[in-house]
Amino acid sequence: MHSSALLVLLCLWPAAALGPSDADHAGVCPNQLNLHLWVDAQSTCERECHSDQDCSSSEKCCTNVCGLLSCVASRVSDGSSEGQWAAGGSGGSAVSCEGFECRQQGAVCELWEGQPVCKCQDLCGSEPSFTCASDGLTYFNRCYMDAEACLQGVELSEVTCRFHLSSPNSSPLPQDPTPPPAPTDADTQTSAPTLYSSPQQQVTYLGGTVSFHCDVIGQPKPEVTWEKQSDEQEQVVMRADQMFGNVVITSIGQLVVYNAQVWDSGIYSCVARNSAGVLRADFSLSVVSHADQDFFDDPAAGLPLGRPFSPADCSAAVERGDCGEKRVDWFFDPARGSCHTFTHGGCEGRNRFHTFEECRASCQREGQAVCSLPAVQGPCRHWQARWFYNSLTERCEAFLYGGCSGNKNSFGTRRECDAHCPTHRPRPCRSCRHRGRIMDTLCSSDFAIVGQLTELIQELDSGMARFHLQQVLRDEKMGLQLFRTQHLEVLLPQVDWSCPCPNITQLQLPLLVMGVVQDGAAILLPHSYARPVSERRLMKIHEALDKNICGTLRRLQD
């Protein structure tokens, strides 16, 4: 036992003798502390390092998915600091966080192995105090904003809340000819998402690592999600800081595929949304086997020197027969006018290509896919007002072009854009109707409130409305009166924003809102009640509630 203790002391002595500048930084890499923090440790391939000394004092040099090392925020083990200090302290001298300053917003001091270190705060109060931040998001309170700033390693500030009460595209479009707009301060004007540079198409060998960066810009900062296009399985929405098999979405919205397999080939779509609009950009990945010796035989053309090719091959039926090992290749779809992946059993078909670029160069006519390209601003600052066709909204929209490194989905006028791309013609909207009489609706609803709409967030086919509560008329499941709730967030899970029901996009008066509660969340369905309130209608509802009309109706139904 004495020899074991002596061995421990001998092992600890060299580390204690090292100066602060020679030792590793305090803490551990996120994935060493908790496997669920793996993505955070892999969050970037850009801040390369060789040791902890290349990073700031609150960071560690950790492994990333690119096979290199990157600086990331160090982590400490919750509740372990006292035990570590009790075992490792010397001379009984008290070490504390007093006077130790954490410069990163949202970081707090804790003891780690007897030394004060900074860590991101992970506990915030439950009292709501909605805080609008400079990243365009609204946080439950300021503590949550500070914690997010620490996790991202950035600075966030509280800003004046901006409420978006109208449809993203309801403002009148600029008239032709469009005058060149003057650049404006991004903090004072919203702008729909645009790409800084055009999407890149990539090819990798089996087992390789590739990454796609959706360098989207916009105000407020767009939220980035990824989807892999597939006709054979349901599409999965991939969000930041998540891992899907061998695919990782980093904290900056970068998609990384490591140990690439043939089934990873395909088109990965980046979807960027903010309150001003939505954008989609497609990135193609082709995974080829080392057995395909001829793949890079013609580096100048980038095409393999294989079988003879005929233009008729592009319209040939896809051969999916079973002739051996399953493979994933590309084919040209004449109906969609673009290239896509398909799985086959190794049979030699005519409409079959190893890579997206081979398929595109062989079959896709010049200008055929222009209308599916995203809006690209480019790195220059010679601002021009241009128009592009948005394949998600199916209409031409204005964007700000920097003057260089764009693409062909950029037109000088709206008329030119409409003539080149198939613009969607909106159908006339029918008036929204709720089911039954107002008293029946009141009694069948889980909640009924009178509130002022303060914020409306619109997604592609869903949304969220925030109300400032003025009266709680009925509440069966949420305890709004018990907790003295002042704000209520209501989910809109099924909305056609071209003809929304209930239509609250243009209403700025106090509303009478009735809906249901599912899993603790307030929800408005297409047939739910949401209309401006009148004193007369409100008086009748109060009278009905005082007389317990809902209880009477329930007994009659039973």
Curated annotation (Swiss-Prot):
Signal sequence, start to end: 1-17
Q: Which Gene3D superfamilies match?
A: 2.40.50.120, 3.30.60.30, Elafin-like, Immunoglobulins, Pancreatic trypsin inhibitor Kunitz domain
Q: Which Pfam families match?
A: I-set, Kunitz_BPTI, NTR, WAP
Biased segments, Pro residues type:
174-183
Compartment annotation: Secreted
Where in this chain does the record put each BPTI/Kunitz inhibitor domain?
314-363, 371-421
Tell me which residues make up the Ig-like C2-type domain. 193-286
PANTHER family on file:
ACP24A4-RELATED, WAP, KAZAL, IMMUNOGLOBULIN, KUNITZ AND NTR DOMAIN-CONTAINING PROTEIN 1
What is its biological role?
Protease-inhibitor that contains multiple distinct protease inhibitor domains. Probably has serine protease- and metalloprotease-inhibitor activity.
What protein name is recorded for this chain? Answer: WAP, Kazal, immunoglobulin, Kunitz and NTR domain-containing protein
Which species does the entry assign this protein to?
Answer: Danio rerio (Zebrafish)
Q: What is the lineage of its organism?
A: Eukaryota, Metazoa, Chordata, Craniata, Vertebrata
Q: Which gene encodes it?
A: wfikkn
